[in-house]
Amino acid sequence: MPIDATRRITAASVRAILLGVADPEIPNVSIVDLGMVEGIALRNGQIAIELLPTFIGCPAQQIIRDAVIEALAPIGLPVTAEFTFRVPWTSDRISPRGRERLASSGFAPPAEPADVRCPYCSSARVAIDSAFGPTQCRSLFYCRDCRQPFEAFKTI
């Protein structure tokens, strides 16, 4: 989407564009809603994005970085996107909309193990199958009511 050159670029307008950058593993949830965008700086005709990885070893960091740069390219300014480790990402950074979208995608949003609910039927009668899911940030659960397996994001 080409950006109107007469429109002033602000951190808010950059953040609005980044709402369209999805997590590669959960296309329904943006990196903004996951709380991964730590900073947006507009200096000397350049845009610098500071990102937080959900886990230090997250294999999707390069994919996310490239997607951020690609999404902001139509603005026509140089863009850098870098991950920082000076502030740790925690699951409480996930926005309410992000939590809703996680649930609608079949993922239980982060909660204490006793508070995990099935994203399909909302039952609290769930059991953890494995603390280790397909990625470091997720665990495997099973719903005793609807009998669906599901993944839950770990509370960090």
Regions of interest found by a model, annotated:
Residues 1-156:
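Domain-level signature for proteins that mediate thiol-based redox and metal-cofactor handling
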